[in-house]
């Protein structure tokens, strides 16, 4: 299972999942129905991620989060949120190859952050049948599925 703030290993690649988002339109949403307080990252989540990174010499291959951090927001012309600044604490500490996020409903490479919407990316595999798609399905030979870019891995 992918647990926010913990480094996991899959197919020989290390990756970190962070539950990071802020509903920028929550004034128009209803708490517990269309937005949830627990979608916001906490200081405990950040501390857990930094400790987990330190146990791996701050090196991971991939970081997955919903939003992209302050730099991505600025590059896209958006005002960064509290969660973006929190994510930066991890992105600025980690030595990583690629950061994947969604949220913006576009496909774009912003430095080391890859925003996914329609793109299909091959990661962590030499097997052409292993892929990640924008609907959040992570297809592996054992039918393990990643239901959302930020979600948890479940075995079907």
Label each PLM-derived region with a short phrase.
Residues 1:
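Glycine/small-residue-rich loop that forms an oxyanion/phosphate-binding "nest" at active or ligand-binding sites
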Residues 4-12, 109-111:
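Short acidic-hydrophobic surface loop/beta-edge motif
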Residues 5-6, 49-54, 87-90:
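Short, flexible, glycine/charge-rich loop motifs used to bind or transfer phosphoryl groups or to couple energy/partner
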Residues 6, 19-22, 67-68, 102-104, ...:
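Active-site metal-binding loops of divalent metal-dependent hydrolases
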Residues 9, 56-57, 91-94:
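Alpha-helix C-terminal capping segments
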Residues 11-79:
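Active-site-proximal loop/helix segment associated with metal-binding centers of metalloenzymes
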Residues 45, 137-156:
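A short C-terminal boundary segment appended to hydrolase-like catalytic domains
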Residues 70-138:
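Conserved beta-sheet core of the metallophosphoesterase superfamily
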């Amino acid at each position: 299972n992918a647990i926010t703030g913990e480094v996991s290993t899959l197919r020989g690649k290390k990756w970190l999942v962070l539950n990071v988002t802020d509903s920028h339109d929550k004034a128009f949403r209803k708490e517990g129905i269309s937005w949830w307080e627990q979608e916001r990252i906490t200081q405990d989540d950040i501390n857990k991620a930094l400790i987990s990174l330190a146990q791996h010499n701050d090196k991971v291959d991939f970081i997955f989060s919903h939003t992209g951090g302050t730099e991505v927001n600025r590059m896209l012309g958006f005002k960064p949120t509290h969660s973006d600044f929190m994510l930066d604490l991890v992105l600025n500490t980690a030595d990583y190859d690629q950061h994947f996020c969604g949220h913006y409903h576009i496909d774009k490479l912003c430095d080391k952050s890859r925003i996914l919407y329609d793109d299909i990316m091959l990661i962590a595999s030499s097997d052409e049948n292993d892929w990640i798609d924008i609907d959040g399905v992570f297809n592996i030979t054992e039918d393990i599925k990643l239901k959302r870019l930020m979600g948890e891995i479940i075995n079907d």
